[in-house]
Amino acid sequence: ELGAGCGVISVLISKKQRPARLVAVEIQPVMYDLLERNVKLNGLDIETVCADMRDAENFVNGADIVVCNPPYRALNSGEGQIKESIKNCRHETLIDLFGAAGAASSVLRFNGSFFLVHQAERFADVACALRANGMELKEACLIKSFSGQVPKLALFKAVKGGKVGLKWLPDLVVFDENGGYTPTVRRLYAMDEQ
């Protein structure tokens, strides 16, 4: 995982998928500390690295899968004064979309998959960043908080060296009409597993 933050995605992947090797890369020391604590608290076998994701190829190469939840917002857009660590998670202060895609491509094997969450409104930017870094967008899923709402996020799957051809998956709705998680989200987060 590139830009692992406090490790939520890595923890979920480790518990649900049990990969042979899982490496979580995070640049911010304060977030890296949370990541390490999360891994230890959950008793998981996740390698953690405090480094810039652009240097990830020094720790990983030939990866089958890379996941990334990069900063969504352009530099100096919105939110006024917030903690620097939070600002770096939300805004392209330390890395932009093209840099994140380049980092993913540098560690993926040919035909490896890159999963990325980003703003739905930046679909064109995502497609351009992926293609510029030798990856082709293969699947996309719009994410809505509630059914009937306009999607704000999207989940993308790209393949390094993949051929042209995008498949749209059904929308992912996070909350049901009562405000609880939908069965799909509960399954994704392994909420009903013992």
Name every feature range the model reports, one short phrase each.
Residues 1-79, 102:
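Conserved SAM/SAH cofactor-binding pocket of Class I
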Residues 54, 143-146, 161:
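Short, solvent-exposed coil/turn elements at secondary-structure transition points
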Residues 70-99:
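Mobile active-site "lid"/loop adjacent to the S-adenosyl-L-methionine
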Residues 73, 133, 161:
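Phosphate/oxyanion-binding loops and surfaces in catalytic or ligand/nucleic-acid-binding neighborhoods
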Residues 94-151:
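Conserved Class I SAM-dependent methyltransferase catalytic core
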Residues 150-194:
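SAM/dcSAM-binding transferase cores
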